[in-house]
From Swiss-Prot:
Key word RNA-binding present: no
Catalytic activity: L-glutamate = D-glutamate
Transmembrane segments: none
Function: Provides the (R)-glutamate required for cell wall biosynthesis.
Protein source organism: Helicobacter pylori (strain Shi470)
Similarity remark: Belongs to the aspartate/glutamate racemases family.
Any one GO molecular function term: glutamate racemase activity
UniProt protein name: Glutamate racemase
Residues the entry annotates as binding substrate: 7-8, 39-40, 71-72, 182-183
E.C. numbers: 5.1.1.3
Residues annotated as catalytic: 70, 181
Length: 255
């Protein structure tokens, strides 16, 4: 089975990593709209247009399924993309909510949603969680993480300063943290470490990772089995510098 993975840049590598590990598919076409990253600071109309243009990119590749590996596009463009597509299109928000439903039984557990400004303002996660009965939901736009990750700044003083800026004002310590941008799993270990060190937690918060969640969702939805295929063939494309994108992929995914 040949599928497509669409992201605003390199954040979708976190989803791609989970897909490669699961070996559910034969071939994966990855498209990063790196010339227009970040999506999280742009308006909904623009993001919808970017999503439709991504569909145009994938048409000649004859994929059978498209994964929108971008929370901002999933929140604001997914429905419009589905209207204009003959193949199934899966976003990352629904699978993440399903993962929480399966793993978090306490409806009063404090849940923190991290995301870009556009994702947070869409209320996509807040509304979906409330529909499932989760009552203690807060959110935080952490958009500065995206350019740091795009620049491969995954640790060090600059990232620490950024986390301190965002997390110090928190009044309620979360038991669950939704990494509501596919860039964020690339610094998941650092986020977990920050909470453990600065808030003196005995156990780390549960981190919900879009990549792992979407693998579980695809297995259930399409009756796919892990390791059913050989290691997938991966082809990279970008609206910007594809050589740079491939270099980042080789470093982060160990290809």
């Amino acid at each position: 089975m040949k599928i497509g993975v669409f992201d605003s840049g390199v954040g979708g590598f976190s989803v791609l990593k989970s897909l490669l590990k699961a070996q559910l598919f034969d071939e994966i076409i990855y498209y990063g709209d790196s010339a227009r990253v970040p999506y999280g600071t742009k308006d909904p109309t623009t993001i919808k247009q970017f999503g439709l243009e991504a569909l145009d990119f994938f048409k000649p590749h004859k994929i059978e399924l498209l994964i929108v590996a971008c929370n901002t596009a999933s929140a604001l463009a997914l429905e419009e993309m589905q209207k204009h597509s003959k193949i199934p299109i899966v976003g990352v928000i629904g699978p993440s909510i399903l993962a929480i439903k399966q793993q978090v039984k306490d409806k009063n557990a404090p849940i923190l949603v991290l995301g870009t400004k556009a994702t947070i303002q869409s209320n996509a996660y807040d509304n979906a969680l409330k529909q499932q009965g989760y009552l203690n939901v807060s959110h935080l736009a952490t958009s500065l993480f995206v350019p740091l990750i795009e620049e491969n700044i995954l640790e060090g003083e600059l990232l620490e300063t950024c986390m301190r800026y965002y997390f110090t004002p928190l009044e309620i310590l979360p038991e669950v943290v939704i990494l509501g941008c596919t860039h964020f799993p690339l610094i998941a270990h650092q986020i977990e470490g920050y909470f453990m060190e600065h808030f003196a937690l005995s156990t780390p918060p549960l981190l919900i990772h879009s990549g792992d969640a979407i693998v579980e969702y695809l297995q259930q939805k399409y009756a796919l089995k892990k390791n059913a295929c050989a290691f997938p063939k991966v082809e990279f494309h970008a609206s910007g510098d594809v050589v740079w994108l491939e270099k980042q992929a080789k470093e982060w995914l160990k290809l």
